[in-house]
């Protein structure tokens, strides 16, 4: 995605004058390494887990529960449940199930309006995780 942003916006819009240096950060995971929320535009890669309950065997030592760094995965009544409000879509759980009950949808979380320097401001995350790359690029534009 970062190469497409470079091609489309840096090269495509290089003649457009902006009021200040426009900063873009693209990160591959939700660990905030590149501080996407502190840039004018920030993008974080997402791996949204999707559970197939028919494939879940409710293992007592569930690999998904063990690897979730957020504690979003729990066994409830013998079935895995993922709390979407707690999950940060890091994707570590994908592939941890021995019965392939979890798959991932890839997406992009977009932040706008961040600023760093003397007066920092955290950008706002758009309310939607974009699963279509072209839609994400159009929103960025």
Predicted feature descriptions by range:
Residues 1-61, 67, 85-86:
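Small-residue-enriched alpha-helical segments and adjacent helix-cap loops
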Residues 31, 41-47, 106, 111-116, ...:
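A domain-level signal for the structural core that forms small-molecule/cofactor-binding pockets
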Residues 50-54, 80-83, 107-113:
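Short, well-ordered strand-loop elements centered on a beta-strand within folded domains, enriched
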Residues 58, 80-83, 129, 133:
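Hydrophobic alpha-helical scaffolding
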Residues 61-80, 92-108:
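Iron-sulfur cluster-binding cysteine motifs and their immediate structural context
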Residues 87, 91:
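Cysteine-rich micro-motifs
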Residues 114-140:
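A hydrophobic, small-residue-rich beta->alpha segment in the mid-to-C-terminal subdomain
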